[in-house]
């Protein structure tokens, strides 16, 4: 459903400015006449990407996959005419900040916000997205280019809190695999949840009382993916099917040596990070359902 205000018609987008596509040639970029933006009368860096609006059905899908709500603080990097921030405010009461380096886009966004009646919920800043503080954001939306997404990735990991959501229209984040990818009328949407940092050595305790068993758990982390081992009594199990989604952790401990008892050694763990400890429930193996807890250190 379209929101009840009109966006300026973009009929000249293919003739008046560069367009963002999956393939942008150097010749196409050079063909654009770019007028430098100014701040306080001083020239600033020109836009890395020239404005092409995200279709409204894609906007709505991006907000839906991120489960945007009035509790969120949404930052749209390269916000163009402000439609993502304004739609979130209009539909969900979300407070939002649009960042764009191009002064005409900022002016247009403010007019659109006023027309939509959401000026009390949204803010538009003329700024370089790479110099923008993202620590208050719980949702970040993007429609940039693959090279810019990859350049932005370290900043997202440095400033966003675990559990924050990132949604990109059209372009991925290099080797940071999306948690979810889908298409809306032929347009790709990529979605990530910022993972907590859980790599390192842990003392893992499964069960309680006389049935408790302790493992030396060692985890390696690549973005949201985990690998590792758990050792107890000289026997080592491998960490399989493991990932981190925000502060939630799931993994399986599996006996990779084979044999008749291997099927009894597949234990499925689900838990959450709370401070410096992991805790949750485990099922499978030869002990049935139980609770588990892990604290930093090997426990040896």
Which role does the model predict for each range below?
Residues 37-72, 103-136:
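S-adenosyl-L-methionine
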Residues 71-80:
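Conserved class I S-adenosyl-L-methionine
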Residues 82-86:
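Glycine-rich SAM-binding Motif I of class I
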Residues 95-100:
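Conserved SAM-binding motif I beta-strand of class I
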Residues 134-152, 157:
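A short SAM/SAH-binding and catalytic strip from SAM-dependent methyltransferases
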Residues 149-199:
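C-terminal substrate-binding/active-site "lid" region of AdoMet-derived donor-dependent transferases
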Residues 198-300:
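Central antiparallel beta-sheet cores of small beta-barrel/beta-sandwich binding domains
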């Amino acid at each position: 459903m379209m929101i009840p205000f009109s966006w300026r018609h973009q009929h000249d987008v293919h003739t008046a400015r560069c367009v963002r596509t999956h393939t942008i040639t150097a010749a196409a970029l050079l063909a654009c006449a770019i007028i430098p933006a100014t701040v306080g009368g001083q020239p600033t860096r020109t836009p890395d990407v020239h404005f092409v609006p995200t279709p409204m059905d894609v906007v709505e899908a991006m907000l839906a996959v991120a489960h945007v709500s009035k509790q969120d603080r949404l930052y749209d990097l390269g916000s163009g005419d402000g439609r993502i921030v304004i739609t979130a405010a209009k539909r969900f009461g979300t407070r939002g900040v649009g960042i764009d380096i191009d002064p005409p886009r900022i002016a247009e966004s403010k007019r659109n916000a006023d027309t939509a009646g959401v000026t009390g919920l949204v803010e538009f800043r003329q700024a370089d997205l790479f110099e923008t503080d993202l620590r208050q954001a719980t949702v970040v939306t993007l429609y940039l280019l693959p090279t810019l997404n990859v350049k932005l990735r370290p900043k997202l990991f440095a400033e966003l809190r675990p559990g924050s959501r990132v949604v990109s229209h059209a372009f991925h984040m290099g080797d940071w695999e999306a948690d979810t990818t889908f298409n809306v009328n032929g347009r790709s949407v990529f979605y990530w949840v910022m993972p907590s940092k859980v790599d390192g050595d842990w003392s893992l305790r499964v069960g309680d009382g006389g049935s408790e068993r302790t493992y030396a758990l060692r985890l390696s982390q690549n973005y949201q993916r985990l690998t590792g081992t758990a050792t107890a009594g000289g026997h080592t199990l491998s960490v399989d099917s493991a990932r981190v989604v925000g502060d939630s952790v799931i993994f399986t401990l599996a006996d990779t040596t084979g044999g008749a008892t291997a099927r009894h050694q597949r234990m499925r763990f689900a838990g959450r990070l709370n401070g410096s400890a992991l805790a949750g429930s485990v099922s499978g193996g030869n002990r049935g359902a139980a609770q588990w807890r892990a604290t930093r250190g090997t426990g040896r």
